[in-house]
Amino acid sequence: MSGIALQGIRCHACRNAAFRSFAAISGLSSSIRRPQSSISYPGSKLYQRNVRTTGRRQFSTLGSVKSQVDSDLPTKTETKEDASAESSHIPWYLQDESHKPSSHPLKQQELPPLPENPPPILENLLQYISVDAGLDDLALLDLRGLDPPPALGANLIMIIGTARSVKHLNVSGDRLCRWLRSNYQLRPIADGLLGRNELKIKLRRRARKAKATGDASSLNSRDDGITTGWICVNVGDVENGPLKTKNSQDRNFIGFGGTEDKVRIVVQMLVEEKRSELQLEALWGSLLNPEAGEMNPAPRDDIWGNLSSETTSSRKGVDSIASTFSQRFPGRRHIHTQARPDTLEPLSHEILGNIVQESRPALPSKIVSTSMASPSVSSLLEQLSQLPEEEARRELGLGPGDRDSTLFLRLFYEAVSKSDTETVLIDKLSFARAAVLLKHPAYSKTDLYRAFKSMAASGCDISEELAMDTVRTLLSFQGPENAANERVPEQDIDLALRVLEHMSLRGIKIFNGEVFFLLHKASAFQSHVLPANDAPGATNTPADPDSISKVPVEELDHITTVHNRLSKLMASANVDFDYKDYPELLKMYFEHGNYSNFWRLWHRIPLMQIPRTKELYLLMFRLHAKLGHQRQAVDCLSSWVPMMAREQPPVALDEELTRDIMACMLVADPAIDQKTDDGTVSQFTRLWKQCLRDLKSFKAANSQ
């Protein structure tokens, strides 16, 4: 086959058929079957009846519509077709296809039946959507009886239709909005709709790019703003039909405003691929008929990902959770008005038990029951917190699946079994937090996040304090204190951000100083670090070189970029840190080489009407002495030692502050002690002599 012929065969099915025909001529057997393009929608038969109209359609579907296979076809015909397709060697262009039945195009144009008490506009709207707009496979969902109402509004009627292409989708949405405005004086809102000129401009730009690259298929993988595939037209509030029930005034009403019987109509217009992906009919159909969903349970995607309690490694669990969120909800927020039920099943324990040594010395348990009755969960956790860390980790057993290896676990799960569902979820979340804070090797932050999402998915009321405790635990360091080059993993930060996002959806204010402080701290190293290319020299000699580790410059630049972005976000949100966090922030900025942010925060403290106390000056002098940078030590001493007397209130010198100033002077001028003895005059000799006199007076005062 020539290259021109291969270029002409763009369709995947045509390429397979051509390959099958040439393979048949050459005597090879091919098992490639022609792909079927019929897609079934589980919720599209909620309202169906016979064809109500066969009017002339402005968007003809006779040439481009995908045929669907009728359910009443005999199985013998399908078996015979498959057998003949596999055994026959007749080329595809010579095969007789007259015996293959095809569904009538009007099957996709059936109008759904009207619900009870339909609004007067509904029948004309369905007629226009099907005949004039040209949407196929219409489905009508009557959501007026849902309690609580959907997020789109109460008394909702939803119409779902399929467009043939993205261009057809935008043209149909635009014409529908114009038709509603001109005929019914409504003001529809179309989310995802591109205007006529905007659509033409984007299509023209895409055509130019495809022509320049010479390959139009390379642009299909990018989101250019045209391939959304979904337009939601909110028709607005319309008059409702006559009610056959008792008068609406007899119904109890709680809230503000009056009781209105208007109906809100929403038209969901999607391309075929987007409709099969979202499955809106199945989602709303399960809410309309929950009994059917219980009788025929099917796997579904949850907003919190997979709720199974399988215990795996921390990295694997985090990756699976992140992939579920990124694929199903890329960069969007979704509002749910009904809680999803969650089954409380014991966590399985298979892999994590190998992390902990199975052979342990049999030590007596320090957890005791203080009364004949079972102790409460709060008292058990309180006793656990009072134990040494090693003994407390021993009381937690082998992992999440262990329930009876220690006395604490037996008492804990016995107390949990007597509580209601909400209390059980809160207790399990507190237990997971305690295990992570104790740095038990078999309990990971992924287990803590699973406990939180189980509580959130069950619809329990999560307090702000409980959610913030979870965020603090997720953003905590797991290694020993001042461990070299330790940072909070990005997976743990991602889990904390998901908890914060859930808090925001629940109306909790997450833009506060504590949240930004935790994010600043989690994105940095736990200990003092220096760039790897910053070798100690005459002007940069750390006081304790072993306590300062070297890291690549790129990592420090990345941390600085993250801190700068967080600072800009705080400025735009008009949020500031809490004063108690200032010393740790100053230390973190300085130890990561972010001196600009250090001095910016240092100068901002008095502007906020907050005095710079002795503790802040002690921190500044100690950081410069530990860094060992001569030039920075000189600038610090010359600028801020005189400034101490000008503070409001003034910072008085004492023995501790004097020693830190002298340590900083030894960095600025290592030979200052010898220069003072020799009588040589230098920049800091006078200050050095004053510090010596002050130390003598302090010692004399202490001796008395």
Swiss-Prot record:
Residues 57-118 are annotated as: Disordered. One of its GO terms (biological process) is mitochondrial gene expression. Residues 73-83 have a biased composition (Basic and acidic residues). InterPro entries: Atp25 (IPR040152), NT_sf (IPR043519). It is found in: Mitochondrion inner membrane. Its main location: mitochondrion. Residues 1-59 form a transit peptide. Residues 57-72 have a biased composition (Polar residues). It is a peripheral membrane protein. One of its GO terms (cellular component) is mitochondrial inner membrane. Keywords: Membrane, Mitochondrion, Mitochondrion inner membrane, Transit peptide. Probable mitochondrial mRNA stabilization factor. Belongs to the ATP25 family. This is ATPase synthesis protein 25, mitochondrial. It comes from Arthroderma benhamiae (strain ATCC MYA-4681 / CBS 112371). The gene is ATP25.
